[in-house]
UniProtKB/Swiss-Prot annotation:
GO terms for cellular component: cytosol. This is Lysine--tRNA ligase. Its EC number is 6.1.1.6. Keywords: Aminoacyl-tRNA synthetase, ATP-binding, Cytoplasm, Ligase, Magnesium, Metal-binding, Nucleotide-binding, Protein biosynthesis. It is an enzyme of class 6 (ligase). Mg(2+) 2 binds at E406.
Length: 489
């Protein structure tokens, strides 16, 4: 396929050709022996006042600025200025700087540190060599709303030119470490479970399907890690968690990506209230570790170290609408209330439990600005949750909402194999009525429960949304290194 290059790209390719013909091919270089990183250079000579000719330093990085005989070089750890003194360097070196070097080139520079008249730490360069030629120029402008898609599509360029973007992803790594530190401090073991599942389960979502050639059957990319983790509790593990990729063949928006990271947590012999405390303590631990007790999301300031609000779903609906679902006993009555309040429902959502959940989504979610635990979800929308024996029709389940978005979902796990079998059957019926997200019958999981699952509490946390919260980003694209994108038109 023939490629077309613009004028700048053609000039850079010509410079590369000249280097190669002069036996200076930068791509032949395998290793650069740096004296130190640029970050270490800036730290070591932070108090330097005069020219230190006794220190001969070799630095390496990308050229991100050029002006006359000055330049700026950048590596992962920082930026520093460099300078070629016309009176000191050879004519050939000066010509190399002026006629061969381009913005974006990766170079090694050798020289000694000094301070300019303006007081800026600078490397007085004796020798400069390109170790990787940039054949594409860096963009001149790389900011503003119009560039958001471009930045996500070409993340490598975004990372080169946008320090703020690099910081977000370094923060992401740091937050993941902090989460693991917290889980380790609570005596949890991190485990790994399969990504390919033979049966769809663990969440209500549409899957990606792939074909296993050897086994001659379809598999699903996991939509949750719940069922295999609960099997580990059956097997005798006490406290486990998994941080990993989840795949859901659904839409994309500011808080959804088809491939995302979640953490699921399971603890034997614990209940919903324990998991609620653990969730609150996790968010507070991360907030304190990052020294961010308050984060700003849009116009809202979120207070993460204050006590999280707790409210039952039915009480919340009554508070916002005046409708008291504690007094509603039939599907027909619920449907009439839905029509009266313009709450639309599909055929598979015509039960009392589904309509309660729809009322919550319609009238209550938007009111959850500060961290709020909403608990007591209907059985109809909670096929894996233990029922609330004091309130038939409801479960021991909660969701954590912050700034109107769900951040965590947890419950006392259903460990009654007979009840679980019946709920799977109900899900199969829902699928036949058009609910593409209903789970399938999983007899292997039923058999695992029949061996005995102790009373268990479980939790799922959306890691990407959590990172959005602590980095104060409004789009999931901004916290994913390589988000899924529509094809270029």
């Amino acid at each position: 396929m023939e490629r077309k290059f613009n004028d700048q790209e053609l000039i850079r390719r010509e410079k590369l050709k000249n280097l190669q013909e002069a036996n200076q091919d930068p791509y032949e270089i395998e290793k650069v022996s740096r004296t130190m990183t640029i970050g270490d250079f800036n730290s070591k000579f932070a108090k330097l006042k005069t020219h230190n000719t006794n220190n001969n330093i070799k630095l390496a990085g990308r050229v991100v600025a050029l002006r006359q005989t000055f330049g700026v070089i950048r590596d992962f750890y920082g930026d520093t200025q460099f300078y070629l003194n016309k009176k000191k360097v050879s004519k050939s070196m000066l010509e190399y700087f002026n006629k061969v070097l381009d913005l974006g080139d990766i170079v090694e520079i050798f020289g000694s540190p000094f301070r300019t008249q303006k007081g800026e730490l600078t490397l007085d360069v004796k020798k400069i060599k390109i170790v990787s030629k940039a054949l594409k120029p860096l963009p001149e402008k790389w900011h503003g709303l119009e560039d958001e898609e471009l930045r996500a599509r070409h993340r490598y360029v975004d990372l080169i030119v946008n320090k703020d973007s690099m910081k977000v992803f370094v923060d992401r790594i740091r937050i993941l470490k902090i989460i693991r530190q917290f889980m380790d401090s609570q005596n949890y073991l991190e485990v790994e479970t399969p990504v390919l599942h033979p049966i769809l389960g663990g969440a209500n979502a549409r899957p990606f399907i792939t074909f296993h050639n050897t086994l001659e059957r379809n598999f699903y990319l996991r939509i949750a890690t719940e069922l295999p983790l609960k099997k580990l509790i059956v097997g005798g593990f006490d406290k486990v968690y998994e941080i990993g990729r989840i795949f859901r063949n659904e839409g994309m928006d500011s808080t959804h990506n088809p491939e995302f990271t979640s953490m699921e947590v399971y603890a034997a012999y614990e209940n919903m209230e324990y998991m609620m405390r653990l969730t609150e303590n996790l968010f507070k631990y991360v907030a304190k570790s990052l020294k961010k007790p308050v984060v700003k999301m849009g116009e809202n300031e979120i207070y993460l170290t204050q006590k999280f609000r707790r409210i039952h779903m039915v009480d919340f609906i009554k508070q916002e609408t005046g409708v008291d679902f504690w007094e509603v006993k039939s599907n027909q009555e619920a449907q009439e209330l839905a029509k009266k309040h313009n709450v639309k429902f599909e055929k598979h959502q015509s039960t009392l439990g589904h309509i309660i959940n729809l009322f919550f989504e319609e009238f209550c979610e938007a009111k959850c600005i500060q961290p709020t635990f909403v608990y007591g979800h209907p059985i109809d929308v909670s096929p894996l949750s233990k029922k609330d024996y004091k309130n038939p029709g409801f479960t021991k389940r909660f969701e954590l909402f912050i700034n109107t978005k769900e951040y965590a979902n947890a419950f006392a796990e259903l460990n009654d194999p007979i009840d679980q079998y019946e709920r799977f059957e109900a899900q199969v019926k829902e699928k036949s009525l058009g609910n593409d997200e209903a789970v399938e019958m999983d007899m292997d999981f039923i058999e695992a429960l029949e061996y005995g699952l102790p009373p268990t509490a479980g939790l799922g946390v959306g890691i990407d949304r959590m990172i959005m919260l602590f980095t104060e980003k409004s789009s999931i694209r901004d916290v994913l290194l390589f988000p899924h994108m529509k094809d270029k038109k």
